[in-house]
Structures are given as structure tokens and as C-alpha cells.
């Protein structure tokens, strides 16, 4: 028991539970509603394994059941399951309504954070513009050197009137090579031709990643079309 590796985070505990109880927990995609009282079942089944404490199990369950993909799975007609995937009764309406409110609040928090970040960017840009518009100190004109009598004036070389236009800087993006590193609520970009649109991860499925664009439209996108 002393030689067992220790799980240091709730995400690691969830990954362990998904491997230990694949018919109950899932590491990605839509999650199934859990049986009421499943915490006690976990304590009895995995108590002592991987040096897991009750506090770690409770924290991992709280993170799992508050994730967007779990809240999406709490819907009318869905059935709760135990650790072995056996049905344990249909969801009650009050539980479905509670999950819906939690999901709405989570989305509102993400939108508020995004709006706050945009406001800070605008403030920084405005501050930079004010510095550029500040009056510059007047420079005193340099004294003109007098030409000696009899000296010939050298013709000035013609300066090029136009400068070659600079090539526009291409914005570099990092492609998403593994969707398992993504988390619900994470901000990224969706490639559309030569452009990349801002988006937020709503759900990670086997077919791809469901994202929501700033326009409010949601769609499922494959990993090769996602970048950071």
C-alpha cells in the first residue's frame, strides 16, 4: 500500500475513476448522471487504493459533477447509474432544473470573464494611443553651416519617393494535436480558410469538439481545424 503512486489532483482522480469504473465515469464526452449516494459506494470500493483520501474523492466528485459535460448529461429522461453502470432511477425534474441553472451560470461567468478581458485590452490600447498623441517637445533648429565662398554646391542624391510595402505579419497559431488536453470552457480558435475565429469549448466528443463561436453559434469541429 505504501508503494502505490499518489494522485495529486482532482483531474488525476477523475481519470483513475474513469479507468476503474468505465461504465459510470468518463474522461471525455457527455457524462452520465451518477447515483445519489455514490460517494459512500466509492469509499467502500476504492478506499485505500492509490492512497486516495475521502477529501480527494469528494473534491473530484464536486469537480466532475460541476463540469459542463456532466451538466449537459443531466436532462429529462436520463437515468442515474451506479459504479458498475446499472440504472438507479430516472432523474427528477428538480435535479434537471438545478443542473440547467448551474450550466447557465457557468456560461454567464465565462462570458463575463471574456468581456472583462476585452475591456482591459481596449483600455490598454486607449492608453497607448494617448501616449502617442501627447505633444512632443519642440526641437531647436540646427544652425545652417555656411558654405565657403567659391565652393561648388554638390547636387543632392535623389531619395526614393516610395518605400516597398511591408508584408503583413502572419499570426502564428499552435495546432491542437490532442483533444484530450482540452477542457470545457477553454478559449481557442477555429480555422476557417485563412482566418481563425475565437471560440469556447462546450463539449469534447468522440467525433470532435463542440465549440461556441462569439456569434453564439455552436458546432462540432475536428481537431485539425482547432488552434491555440
Curated annotation (Swiss-Prot):
Give the family from UniProt.
Belongs to the ProQ family.
What's in the keyword line of the UniProt record?
Chaperone, Cytoplasm, RNA-binding
Purpose = RNA chaperone with significant RNA binding, RNA strand exchange and RNA duplexing activities. May regulate ProP activity through an RNA-based, post-transcriptional mechanism.
Q: What is its main location?
A: cytoplasm
Q: What is this protein called?
A: RNA chaperone ProQ
Instruction: Name its species.
Output: Salmonella typhimurium (strain LT2 / SGSC1412 / ATCC 700720)
Q: Where is the composition biased (Basic and acidic residues)?
A: 117-136, 146-175
Q: Output a single Gene Ontology CC term carried by this record.
A: cytosol
Quick one: a GO biological-process term for this protein? post-transcriptional regulation of gene expression
Q: Which GO terms describe its molecular function?
A: RNA strand annealing activity; RNA strand-exchange activity
Give me the ranges of the annotated region Disordered.
107-178
